[in-house]
Amino acid sequence: MADAPITHGGNLHEAALRYGIPRDAWLDLSTGINPHGFPVPPVPADAWRRLPEDDGVLAAHAARYYRAPGAAHVLPVAGSQAAIRALPALFARGTVGVAPLAYSEYAPAFARHGHSGAPLDCGADTLPAALTYAIVANPNNPTAERVDRTRLLRWHAQLVARGGALIVDEAFSDAESDAHASLAADTHRDGLVVLRSVGKFFGLAGVRAGFALAAPALLARLRDALGAWTVSGPARHAVLAAFADAAWQHAMRERLAHDGARLAALLRAHGFVTHATPLFSWSADPRAHALHDALAARGIWTRYFAHAPSVRIGLPAGDDDWRRLDRALAARVPTLAAAARRPFASDPQG
């Protein structure tokens, strides 16, 4: 399982080959990335020429933005994905709990380092005694499920008492209005790791920058595992500018709240029950593959989950894209009931 290829959203090259539609003709709604990205100011020439210096500035700004206990509790990384792959090697072998439908990199990252896996019930107050670790996204990708901080801290206490740890991936939390749901301020606690990403809310997935928040001793080991220069000079410039622009952040949260509600309402109007964050809607429906395939035939790419038939749809960027999605749904949804009864070849996405 650990060595199986993992497919993510945003794979337009694959979509173009499969459906015979040129790459630039696609409307890509397959990710939960903000389509209204932060306008990065011009990058200074030195950011390109010089090696990035670990002067603590980026960690200090991140600590203020995320409300972490301090800069010593923050490690800049090349996207939270880098930390997800590296962290399991720092823990003694055990059993990790992962939600049945979650980010597809979690379980393989732990399996790669000899850990076993078990399903995680995000509604449970008490974790199974067999679990040593748990990794949970809050809100979850793709189901949009949220776990309240009281339950998360209860889980953390249970796991630490067993010599384990809790990892909370808050990659999609920046767009949420309730900052108090974050555990970033609690990362002085041993056995707690919080992962944050600038790719989703700020729409800067291409800069590959994120942060691991934890006790300094664990971050020192993670720093050694990842090596030097994990975040490039241009990426540091972009992230610092994004953190400093509080007015943009406030306006964008309001815009995404509106757009996220609009997308959920549009899908409901076409007969799909949805669970949503401000950045995407998710629907578990027998017609999920038929919907994914029908939209793809019209050049609209979504994220289909084959092992738990469901589809995730991200935000359109502008009015033309909204109309294109609405027209495609109106044209194809009436045919989906029949299409859903026909067998489909296995889809590699998961």
Indicate residue ranges for each PLM-predicted region.
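N-terminal "arm"/small-domain region of PLP-dependent enzymes with the aminotransferase-like
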Residues: 1-56, 61
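Short beta-strand
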Residues: 28, 76, 195, 272-277, ...
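Conserved beta-loop-alpha segment that forms the PLP phosphate-binding cup at the N-terminus of a helix
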Residues: 71-96, 106, 210
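Conserved PLP-anchoring active-site segment centered on the Schiff-base-forming lysine
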Residues: 88-111, 116-119, 123-124
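Active-site phosphate-binding strand-loop segment of PLP-dependent enzymes
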Residues: 118-176
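PLP-dependent enzyme catalytic core of the Aspartate aminotransferase-like
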Residues: 150, 297, 307-350
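PLP-dependent aminotransferase class I/II
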Residues: 191-267, 272-273
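Conserved PLP-binding catalytic core of the aspartate aminotransferase-like
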Residues: 257, 265-298, 315
